[in-house]
Amino acid sequence: MGAAGDVTGYDMPPLMLTPDEIEAAVLGAQWVAGRGDPVLAKAARDLISKIASAVPERLRPYVLEPATGAPPAWTTAPDGLDIARTRAWIHAGRKIRLDYRDERGTVSQRVIWPVTVGYRETVRMLIGWCELRQAFRTFRTDRVVEAEFLDERHGQRPGQLRTRWQKHLEAEHAAWKAQTP
């Protein structure tokens, strides 16, 4: 069973990729291999191997000797929760209870409806609807003290929740632009 809990894989129809598309896929996979959670990082390395074995010989240098590269993130902070399981809960539309330590060291308990896991250069972020604050919030995964993966569903399809979050981001950005000279 895959990380999402319901899909293990499938046979992808043949794709005709340009050299630029191959390099883009490899670059993205390199970045994830260096910064993703262990399950996603392994999947990214496997993807590069699959691309290398599937492309014609004349295109293999774009995979094995690309002109672009993503250096590994040597200082990624350790996560306080299982990110692969978090991704599965996002797909399933289930809630997560967090004991979360803020930047001042204060610990609070939050129940969130997880939306997405975001990646910064050295830290991962969990974005979710916070029941306590009744708003979308961003939680650094290295500040999670404890996580309980609840069986309770939050009642929205993951795509609907993500759309709400994206609209929230757009509104925040518009408000910021209106205040910026």
Question: Which residues does each PLM region occupy?
Answer:
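Short glycine- and basic-residue-enriched patches
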Residues: 1-181
